[in-house]
A protein has these predicted regions:
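Conserved pre-ATP/AMP-binding loop-to-beta segment of ANL
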Residues: 13-15, 150-168, 174-175, 200-208
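Conserved AMP-binding A3 loop
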Residues: 31-35, 164-191
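Conserved AMP-binding/adenylate-forming
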Residues: 45-93, 211-214
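Conserved AMP-binding/adenylation subdomain of ANL enzymes
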Residues: 187-208, 216-257, 271-272
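Gly/Ser/Thr-rich phosphate-binding loop
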Residues: 256-259, 271-340, 354
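AMP-binding/adenylate-forming catalytic core of the ANL superfamily
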Residues: 258, 378, 384, 404-483
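Conserved ATP/PPi-binding loop(s) of AMP-dependent carboxylate-activating enzymes
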Residues: 344-352, 362-394, 414, 427-428
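Conserved C-terminal "lid"/linker of ANL adenylate-forming enzymes
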Residues: 448-450, 460, 472-524
């Protein structure tokens, strides 16, 4: 990854990158060729070396969302260091806990991140050997003026099984884990698999690929390697979840292939209803991180003017990469198909992944059609958790990885995802109920069903204004098992992870003052 752009530039790859806003690197450009990116990564490597980073040192990166997270990571890899991307959307005390585990030689951040933490009584710079601030001068830290012009040492190779990068899990159930991947696991097993030009879904030379991700997530590090190897004509990077800000960028560069996490698709869905919507040329939508609700998928497939647009849904984890995949068409999410949801996350990735569903207590395999704990076996499994090796080891059983998800293996081999074990409600799939409610309540942006011991499930609905019509709610829930009265909130009132996923335990605690659930949380 340290010489990725150098090698691609040598092949004369004509890909052009367009940004929705400049990088947070003191550079006002919004357009880059591959050779420009190679030069930028070399320059960043010089900055990190000047800040004191070297072979096997950890470099923590905490900043506002943008793809420069991955360019800084490539620069760290180039000098033999190990980058660790941390989302600035994490609470400051969580960032503090992660930095203590990492013990980084260098922290790369911004003045706003430091000030936000300082307001909470936390000095993030105190947890790193040196802190490099990208956008100004902060006492006790280095600024860009202190490191510019430093020549980095030549690229340093490492063994394929040595730590290459650290990325954190979503943290939906508490403090995220720090996942360690090697070149073999994240590049050799994951990125290389994505560089194959598969029929129909494979990248083409005339494609415009748009990515609107959470760039602190490990997915985009892998994506960076695969996307540039496939050499589309244009790559468009969107760093903001504000649909009105994204709209002009999408209209200037209408995507033929679009990738984003579920939360971003939900936020951008309003664009599908606008005149001459920006998704009219899109032939493939890619959703990562989590399953999505059918109404959102339907809105994008309907917006495309292509004859047969596809939605590719992946389910996996930071520790393993993708475990399953499934394709949706306009027909598969047609509301006329009563009861159909997107909880079926498809089939295990061929050749790469094996899945098994077992009883959570005995770990004996359960028959097809019965719910159980989902186990996975893949060569892409991470190496460890930083500072939590015991926790990493506890998620292994007989050579299998314990995902912590509950699911059903169907007769055809596909998997229905039910719930995280920690979020489960006996006799109910919260995720399926959420699918049904979102289908019946088009004014709802998102629905979250929370389980509480001794009480009926608690539904939380997200609307634009935080209001919900009671009559509509009663009609939507007339044939669903008893639920508590719904709580309506706005999008920004919901605690979320860096990828926009709902932090269910935090939400439960905010509403009920308790985080007690039906699940054990043994495999979080």
């Amino acid at each position: 990854m340290g010489v990725l752009f150098d090698e691609i530039a040598e092949h004369g790859t004509p890909t052009t990158v367009h940004l929705d806003r400049p990088f947070d690197l003191g550079d006002d450009r919004r357009k880059f060729g591959v050779a420009d990116l190679a030069e930028l990564v070399q320059e960043l490597a010089g900055w990190l070396a000047a800040a004191g980073a070297g072979h096997r040192d950890r470099v923590a990166i905490v900043k506002e969302n943008h793809w420069d997270y991955d360019l800084l990571s490539c620069a760290a890899v180039r000098i033999g260091a190990v980058p660790a991307k941390l989302s600035d959307r994490l609470p400051s005390n969580t960032v503090e806990a992660l930095l203590k585990r990492l013990d980084p030689k260098v922290l790369v951040t911004t003045a706003a991140v430091l000030e936000h933490a300082r307001a909470a009584g936390i000095d993030l710079a105190s947890f790193a050997g040196t802190t490099l601030v990208l956008d100004g001068a902060v006492p006790g830290t280095l600024s860009l003026d202190d490191v510019r012009g430093h020549t980095a040492p030549g690229p340093r190779r490492r063994h394929d099984d040595e730590p290459l990068a650290v990325m954190h899990t979503s943290g939906t159930t508490g403090t995220p884990k720090l996942v360690v991947h090697s070149r073999n696991t994240i590049i050799g097993q994951l990125a290389r698999f994505e560089t194959v030009r598969y029929p129909v879904i494979g990248m083409r030379g005339d494609d415009t690929l748009v990515n609107a991700s959470a760039y602190a997530h490990g997915r985009t590090f892998c994506w960076t390697a695969s996307a540039f190897c496939l050499a589309p004509r244009e790559i468009v990077v969107i760093s903001q979840q504000d649909a009105d800000r994204a709209d002009p960028v999408l209209r200037a560069h209408p995507p033929t292939v679009m990738e984003a996490p579920p939360a971003t698709y939900v936020r951008f869905a309003q664009l599908t209803e606008r005149l001459d919507n920006p998704f009219r040329r899109t032939r493939l939508f890619v959703s990562t991180y989590d399953a999505m609700h059918p109404p959102t998928i339907r809105s994008y497939l309907t917006a495309s003017h292509r004859k047969r647009p596809l939605w590719m849904q992946g389910w996996g984890q930071s520790e393993t990469g993708p475990l399953t995949f499934r394709f949706h068409t306009r027909s598969s999410v047609d509301p006329k198909h009563s009861g159909r949801t997107s909880r079926n996350v498809g089939y295990a990735v061929p050749v790469k992944t094996r899945l098994r569903v077992v009883d959570p207590d005995s770990f004996e395999p359960v028959p097809r059609g019965r719910p159980g704990l989902v186990l996975a076996k893949t060569a892409a499994r991470c190496l460890d958790y930083v500072g939590e090796t015991d926790r990493w080891q506890a998620k292994h059983w007989g050579g299998w990885w314990i995902t912590g998800d509950l699911g059903v293996r169907n007769r055809d081999g596909s998997v229905d995802l039910l719930d995280r074990e920690v979020d489960m409600v006996p006799g109910l799939s919260c995720l399926r109920v959420e699918d049904i409610l979102e289908e019946r309540l088009p004014q709802v942006l998102e629905c979250v069903v929370l389980g509480q011991p001794g009480k009926a499930p608690l539904p939380v609905v997200v609307t634009v204004d935080g209001e919900l019509d009671n009559a509509s709610w009663l009609r939507a829930t007339h044939d669903i098992l008893p639920l508590q009265a719904p709580i309506a909130l706005t999008w920004d009132q919901i605690p979320r992870t860096g990828t926009g996923k709902v932090r269910r335990l935090a939400l439960l605690q905010e509403i009920t003052a308790t985080d007690e659930t039906h699940g054990t949380g043994r495999w979080t």
